[in-house]
């Protein structure tokens, strides 16, 4: 048994552990070569780590062992206990518990094997130890074997088929069986049967007899037939009756011995066996002789015996062989003791396994008894000098079978009143935790909470936590180590202790890291104490299955509420400490100072070893920062030119105050730390306005080794003589890190900075203000603006709105001067153009941003004079440009309001606010055009003057703008000239919307000389003709919408003779109109609002073609006769005839078989 100290000196390990409360650099490992060492662990008497080794084999039939391990000696020694010989294989050390007031240790072995007949029971045994000796053994005495009362009847065959010798042998067998059982738990009765029945003694007579075996002396054979069924009926109705001494709660057993099948009996077995079953009689049938080799005889034994028959039948070849089965019969009868009866309580605690869990309470130790009452479970409370009290759910009428109540036990206190919390991880396969409290000296269930996942083992571990250390339990942690998720295994529920008799619920759940689905997070829980110095209790949770059973432990801090932080502050993996560790975190114990440094320690059990981890002392750092002088004088930063000419010196004084935050026994001189100071001027600014004299730049670093005292240092700052921004104070930022120095006297224990300690500090160095003798700046601001060159705003055409703004200050210097514009949402700020300035030392910069104000669609644009002072007597002019949304809705007038304010908090005046209105119209782009499909040309003759022809004009109307609007489409059609109809029955149609209605009205012709006008310009329109005007109103002409209109009527020809023209153009006109007070056509696009369509009308003359046809025909005939005569004269017709004849002769000759010679060719 040796002690191993592991010093992890690697830089990476050191770096990762600096911010953690549990020290992993210097730890103590206790190793013992005993099976199960580390399965349980408990801190004891602020000096020892007590470790259980429940699997250790100490001697024959003895298992388990205890060890006490000391930090100072680094060794483990066995704790010698006088284990009684009856504590067979008890697994001592499987559960451990301790208390400090007074110092007591409870070590339990819950697997004491107790043999009763053929049954092996599991009870428990615990040892209560004081600082020097064993004080008590729990339970005080060994549990005796349960005594089940048994009433046994022998029903023996006395028929004539049995010889007197065999009858005597059978009686000896009966005598031997009776002698194997003890009174008073077992009593016998004897009846002999043939065709007669004789009761030799009853249970009552057996109980009264001083020598029961003497009752067998008067038994003589009856002789006769074999009435077995009737005999069984007599036994059921008579011997197993209370009047014959039968006991109500005793097991009823009937042993029938016969040499053959029943004979002459009027009853059948089916008549009597159901009676025996209803009475709960267990029947054994013993068949003697060769008769039972017959199938029918064997069936009788099956009918007599209880089921299963093979367990209740004995068959021997002769009576001499009965002695061979007497032990078998005995064992079978003994085995009946393990069966349950309706009211028996003898077997309720035979598998109790007391001490499976243990906890100390003010009233005495409590031992979990998970196996009691068919593994329903419960717990025993052992008050001093009093009988134990059994606590379970029997009074709650709840089915708790196989729940393992008492698997874990914990004490809860609320204002001095104690409650007991028991875990039942197998309750309905999901688990449960139950709170018991005393009511009228009876332990009753107060509240319960159940698990949510089958197999999660909710309630396998419990931990009572007093977060705020006020002496009352605030919450109970309930582990469910087998809770399964895809990426992590196990969880711990945080359940506030219910007040009064309210429902118990859990308001949070703690988890381990992801990636460990078999981690068993929550297998072990312990209270560690306040390790980070915030005066709130912290807890540790074990996860022994993580990283392939290497294990890990998690530290969770307490938080106000009170509750537990949902995220862990530290995780220690077993592989981080040693590659050989297995099941690290399977047992935990914390809260005591074993290393004598005033800090609580943590003992962690693993396979074959226990590791002792110390907590580190926690430090707190306070900081103060001052400047000398407290503000920068004006002479140091005011200048009229942007030239750095000289520098001013300012001194900064920084003090650090280091103190202990956690209570410990370490001296002030012992605790030292390496502190790194990182200083920066104007962090976040592109260029600093000051530098350190030491480094000539904006940053500086120093490293100091400091103890628990105040430490101050001075730093000189240099400032340029011309500062661009003298409004915003110069910022000095301090960032420090603290690394504790190892304490050699305490095995290199390192202090640490509190995790929630502030590490960043800032101080501001302001600039002196020019505010007069009273140091209160009273500015006098004013503002006005105009819209240069703009009389009205045309939305959709004017994409920008320019406001020329003038701001002035007639008072003292103004700081943080801001100009705020209030405008509709249709306007959005774009940019400002800086203009003229008067009275300012340096240039001005304006920075603007916009934001909505309220829910009325109003926006606010603020422009800050950045970051300078707006001097008294100064005046600036700038141009603010706003984008105007083409779809903006601004009403008929735009109101723009401007306000000027400052950080001087000077009361507002009429000059600080200015507003101006601007008329608003909305630009539209509507177009009307003539459609290409219309009647372009018509002609007629004089004979058709009284007729007419259908004419059609078509127009297309489009909204090409970005806004819907109501419009009217007007059409002018000439219908009358000098009281004569021109265009008749004219109608307007709109195919896309037949429901659109158009109105019409006649317009009289102007009083003018139409004939003179049309002679100059042969065009008929409404300037000279009477017209019909159509008006079609469109309530909403949508964006990109297209409308088609058709004018159709009968165009007459008769009126044309008035104008003395053969060709004239008939013109219709279409025009778009709208409300010009609201809308305006885009500039330059007005011509597209009007269009016309023209149809040309022409008159023609009709000519007579007869003379021309007759003259042409006669002339043609005369010409043909002349040509024929000429051809005849030249012999044209004769030559042709001769050639035709010769060709005909040439074709006939070959047919007659002779060849006609060719005429000689002419030469």
Curated annotation (Swiss-Prot):
Residues 20-1107 are extracellular. InterPro entries: FG-GAP, Int_alpha_beta-p, Integrin_alpha, Integrin_alpha_C_CS, Integrin_alpha_Ig-like_1, Integrin_alpha_Ig-like_2, Integrin_alpha_N, Integrin_dom_sf. The keyword Electron transport does not apply. It is found in: Membrane. One of its GO terms (molecular function) is integrin binding. Mg(2+) binds at residues 157, 159, 161, 259. The keyword Isomerase does not apply. GO terms for cellular component: cell surface; external side of plasma membrane; ficolin-1-rich granule membrane; integrin alphaX-beta2 complex; integrin complex; membrane; plasma membrane; secretory granule membrane. Ca(2+) 1 binds at residues 466, 468, 470, 474. Predominantly expressed in monocytes and granulocytes. Residues 1-19 form the signal peptide. GO terms for biological process: animal organ morphogenesis; cell adhesion; cell adhesion mediated by integrin; cell-cell adhesion; cell-matrix adhesion; defense response to virus; heterotypic cell-cell adhesion; integrin-mediated signaling pathway. SMART domains: Int_alpha, VWA. Glycans are attached at residues 61, 89, 392, 697, 735, 899, 939, 1050. Ca(2+) 3 binds at residues 593, 597, 601. Ca(2+) 2 binds at residues 530, 532, 534, 538. It is a single-pass type I membrane protein. Heterodimer of an alpha and a beta subunit. Alpha-X associates with beta-2. The integrin I-domain (insert) is a VWFA domain. Integrins with I-domains do not undergo protease cleavage. This is Integrin alpha-X. It comes from Homo sapiens. The gene is ITGAX.
């Amino acid at each position: 048994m040796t002690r191993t100290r592991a010093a992890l000196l690697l830089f990476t390990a050191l770096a990762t552990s600096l911010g953690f409360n549990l020290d992993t650099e210097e730890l103590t490992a206790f190793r013992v070569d005993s099976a199960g060492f580390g399965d349980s662990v408990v801190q004891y008497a602020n000096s020892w780590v007590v470790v259980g080794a429940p699997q250790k084999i100490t001697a024959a039939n003895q298992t388990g062992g205890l060890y006490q391990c000391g930090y100072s000696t680094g060794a483990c020694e066995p704790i010698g206990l006088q284990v009684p010989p009856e504590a067979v294989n008890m697994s001592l050390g499987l559960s451990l518990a301790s208390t400090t007031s007074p110092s007591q240790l409870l070590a339990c072995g819950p697997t004491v094997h107790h043999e009763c007949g053929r049954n092996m029971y599991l009870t428990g045994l615990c040892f209560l130890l004081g600082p020097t000796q064993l004080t008590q053994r729990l339970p005080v005495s060994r549990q005796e074997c349960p005594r089940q009362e048994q009433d046994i009847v022998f029903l023996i065959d006395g028929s004539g088929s049995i010889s007197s010798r065999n009858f005597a042998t059978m009686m000896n067998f009966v005598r031997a069986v009776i002698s194997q059982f003890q009174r008073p738990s077992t009593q016998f009765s004897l009846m002999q049967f043939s065709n007669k029945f004789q009761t030799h003694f009853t249970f009552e007579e057996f109980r009264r007899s001083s020598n029961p075996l003497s009752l067998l002396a008067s038994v003589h054979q009856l002789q006769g037939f074999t009435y077995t069924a009737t005999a069984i009926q007599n036994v059921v109705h008579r011997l197993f009756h209370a009047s014959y001494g039968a006991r109500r709660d005793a097991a009823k057993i009937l042993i029938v011995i016969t040499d053959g099948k029943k004979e002459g009996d009027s009853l059948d077995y089916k008549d009597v066996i159901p009676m025996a079953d209803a009475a709960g009689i267990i029947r054994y049938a013993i068949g003697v002789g060769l008769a039972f080799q017959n199938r029918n005889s064997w069936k009788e034994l099956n009918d007599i015996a209880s089921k299963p028959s093979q367990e209740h039948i004995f068959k021997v070849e002769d009576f001499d062989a009965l002695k061979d089965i007497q032990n078998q019969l005995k064992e079978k009868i003994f085995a009946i003791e393990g069966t349950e009866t309706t009211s028996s309580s003898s077997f309720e605690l035979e598998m109790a396994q007391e001490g499976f869990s243990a906890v100390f309470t003010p009233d005495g130790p409590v031992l979990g008894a998970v196996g009691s009452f068919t593994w329903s479970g419960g717990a025993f409370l052992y008050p001093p000098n009093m009988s134990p009290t059994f606590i379970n759910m029997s009074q709650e009428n709840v089915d708790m079978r196989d729940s393992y109540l008492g698997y874990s036990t914990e004490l809860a206190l609320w204002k001095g009143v104690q409650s007991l919390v028991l875990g039942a991880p197998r309750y309905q396969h999901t688990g449960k935790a139950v709170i018991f409290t005393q009511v009228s000296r009876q332990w009753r269930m107060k509240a319960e909470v159940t698990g949510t996942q089958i197999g999660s083992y909710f309630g396998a571990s419990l931990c009572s936590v007093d977060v705020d250390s006020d002496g009352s339990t605030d919450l109970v942690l309930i582990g469910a180590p087998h809770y399964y998720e895809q990426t992590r295994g196990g969880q711990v529920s945080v359940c506030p202790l219910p007040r009064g008799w309210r429902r118990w619920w859990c308001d949070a759940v703690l988890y381990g890291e992801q990636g460990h689905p078999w981690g068993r997070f929550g297998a072990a829980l312990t209270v560690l104490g306040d390790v980070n110095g915030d005066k709130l209790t912290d807890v540790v949770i074990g996860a022994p299955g993580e990283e392939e059973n290497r294990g890990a432990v998690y530290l969770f801090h307490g938080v106000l509420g009170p509750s537990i932080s949902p995220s862990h502050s530290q995780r220690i993996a077993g592989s981080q400490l040693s590659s050989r560790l297995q099941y690290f975190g399977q047992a935990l114990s914390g809260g005591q100072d074993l290393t004598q440094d005033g800090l609580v320690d943590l003992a962690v059990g693993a396979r074959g070893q226990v590791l002792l981890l110390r907590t580190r002392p926690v430090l707190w750092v306070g900081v103060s920062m001052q400047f000398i002088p407290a503000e920068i004088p004006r002479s140091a930063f005011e200048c009229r030119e942007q030239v750095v000419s000289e520098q001013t010196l300012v001194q900064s004084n920084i003090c650090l105050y280091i103190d202990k935050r956690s209570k410990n026994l370490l001296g002030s001189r012992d605790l030292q730390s390496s502190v790194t100071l990182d200083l920066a001027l104007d962090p976040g600014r592109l260029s600093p306005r000051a530098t350190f004299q030491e480094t000539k730049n904006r940053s500086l670093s120093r490293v100091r080794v400091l103890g628990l005292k105040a430490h101050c240092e001075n730093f000189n700052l240099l400032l340029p003589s011309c500062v661009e921004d003298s409004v915003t104070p110069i910022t000095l930022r301090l960032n420090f890190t603290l690394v504790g120095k190892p304490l050699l006297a305490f095995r290199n224990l390192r202090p640490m900075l509190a995790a929630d300690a502030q590490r960043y500090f800032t101080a501001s160095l302001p600039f002196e203000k020019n505010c007069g003798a009273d140091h209160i700046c009273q500015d006098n601001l004013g503002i006005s603006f105009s819209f240069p060159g703009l009389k009205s705003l045309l939305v959709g055409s004017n994409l920008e709105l320019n406001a020329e703004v003038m701001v002035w200050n007639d008072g003292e210097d103004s700081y943080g001067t801001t100009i705020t514009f209030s405008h509709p949402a249709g306007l959005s700020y774009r940019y400002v153009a800086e203009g003229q300035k008067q009275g300012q030392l340096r240039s001005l910069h304006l920075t603007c941003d916009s934001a909505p104000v309220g829910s009325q669609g109003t926006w606010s644009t603020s422009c800050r004079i950045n970051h300078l002072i707006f001097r008294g007597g100064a005046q600036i002019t700038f141009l603010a440009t706003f984008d105007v949304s083409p779809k903006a809705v601004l009403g008929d007038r735009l109101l723009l309001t401007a306000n000027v304010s400052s950080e001087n908090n000077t009361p507002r005046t009429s000059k600080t606010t200015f507003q101006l209105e601007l008329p608003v119209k909305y630009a539209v782009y509507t177009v009307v055009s003539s459609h290409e499909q219309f009647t372009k040309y018509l002609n007629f003759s004089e004979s058709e003057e009284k007729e007419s022809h259908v004419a059609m004009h078509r127009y297309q109307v489009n909204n090409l703008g970005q806004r819907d609007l109501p419009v009217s489409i007007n059409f002018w059609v000439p219908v009358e000239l000098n009281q004569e109809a021109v265009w008749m029955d004219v109608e307007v149609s709109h195919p896309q919307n037949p429901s659109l209605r158009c109105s019409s009205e006649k317009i009289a012709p102007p009083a003018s000389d139409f004939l003179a006008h049309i002679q100059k310009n042969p065009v008929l329109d409404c300037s000279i003709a009477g017209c019909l005007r159509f008006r079609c109103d469109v309530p909403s002409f949508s964006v990109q919408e297209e409308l088609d209109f058709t004018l159709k009527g009968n165009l007459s020809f008769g009126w044309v003779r008035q104008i003395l023209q053969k060709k004239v153009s008939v013109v219709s006109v279409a025009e778009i109109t709208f409300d010009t007070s609201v809308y305006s056509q885009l500039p330059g696009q007005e011509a597209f609002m009007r269009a016309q369509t023209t149809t040309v009308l022409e008159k023609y003359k009709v000519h007579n073609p007869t003379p021309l046809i007759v003259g042409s025909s006669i002339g043609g005939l005369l010409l043909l006769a002349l040509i024929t005569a000429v051809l005849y004269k030249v012999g044209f017709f004769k030559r042709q005839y001769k050639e035709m004849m010769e060709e005909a002769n040439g074709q006939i000759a070959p047919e007659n078989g002779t060849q006609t010679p060719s005429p000689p060719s002419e030469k």
